[in-house]
Amino acid sequence: MTKLKFLALAIALLCGATQLSAKDYQVSDFGAKADGITLNTGAIQRAIDAVNERGGGRLVFGPGKYLTGSIYLKSNVTLHLERGAVLLGSTNPFDYVKDPYVRWMAMVFAMKQENIGITGKGTIDGQGFKTANNMVQYIQRGIYEDPLKLDRPNETNRPENIYFRECTNVTI
């Protein structure tokens, strides 16, 4: 019985130590601007990479609008949107990367990652209607192909908000 109690105590301490080691990082410390105008894709991705390399934690978005294109969430990183924070999708379709593995575009990608999440009281606004209208204009001007002649982007050319694939331990 004492071995069982010791094992339970050791597990509890390890779980507590893992929680204590999780740290908060402010996305603004990596150069992200909450003005709704500045394209923050690079700053947000650098922040995600840094948090991942440091063992994980929460990447905190304070109040404001953070304009972004495609970002890749990595293991042990949680995007935390405080009340009043908006992760705002760019309306420029060229700000999104078509992932070569899945051939889709998304604002937030995660592929084969673990212990990831998006939490908080903030908002994710992909601005899908505006983005779709911009894509239709690009089709009409011959910039985007429309092989089916539907005068709209096909499914692989429209960015999704969130695309997680083969991920474990996901919190939304």
Describe the function of each predicted region.
Residues 1-8:
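Bacterial N-terminal signal peptides that target proteins for export
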Residues 8-16:
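Bacterial N-terminal signal peptides
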Residues 20-172:
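Extracellular/periplasmic carbohydrate-active domains that bind, remodel
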